């Protein structure tokens, strides 16, 4: 926060490097059950003010996979799906979807090999309060399959 980037003003606040390293290690060791984006978009007016007056929050949905994949080395695709989809469903008592004939599906397609640098014009959100704009990330969500629509982002 040395440069007072209001896109980094979040609650709970960002922690020390040691805390972030411990969190990465906890994910690697399987001590973290799930990851959520806590997507909290804001209009630019609420973020282009003095740090103390800026709203808490950042967008996270569009970069959640890439940021996690970048931050946690050697995260397998299966572990990623567990953290973002399977385990949250278990925690909240939701049915886990199955793949079967005539079964409606809802999937996110991701490619862990894509290296990219998010830019404001890449975002689908109406908000752009992301601290990851201009930062190199590894892995990208490339599309969604839904009963009513197929969307590809590449």
Each predicted region: which residue ranges?
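His/Asp/Glu-enriched, well-ordered alpha-helical/loop segment
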Residues: 25-29, 34-35, 40-112
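A generic local structural motif
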Residues: 19-23, 95-96, 130
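A short acidic, glycine-rich active-site loop
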Residues: 8-18, 55-60, 130-137
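N-terminal start-of-chain detector that recognizes signal peptides
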Residues: 5-8, 79-82, 114-119, 123
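C-terminal cap of metal-dependent C-N hydrolases
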Residues: 50-53, 104-154
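Short acidic, glycine/serine/threonine-rich loops at helix termini
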Residues: 1-3, 45-49, 120-122
């Amino acid at each position: 926060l040395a440069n007072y980037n209001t896109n980094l003003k979040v609650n709970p606040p960002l922690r020390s490097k040691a805390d972030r390293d411990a969190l990465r290690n906890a994910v690697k060791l399987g001590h973290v059950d799930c990851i959520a984006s806590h997507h909290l978009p804001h209009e630019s007016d609420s973020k282009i003010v003095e740090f103390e007056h800026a709203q808490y929050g950042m967008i996270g949905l569009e970069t959640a996979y890439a940021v996690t994949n970048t931050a946690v080395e050697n995260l397998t695709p299966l572990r990623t799906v567990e953290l973002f989809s399977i385990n949250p469903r278990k925690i909240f008592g939701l049915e886990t979807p199955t793949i079967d004939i005539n079964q409606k599906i809802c999937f996110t397609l991701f490619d862990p090999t894509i290296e990219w640098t998010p830019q404001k014009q890449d975002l689908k959100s109406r908000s752009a309060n992301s601290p990851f704009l201009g930062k190199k990330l590894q892995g990208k969500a490339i599309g969604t399959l839904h009963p009513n629509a197929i969307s590809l982002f590449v």
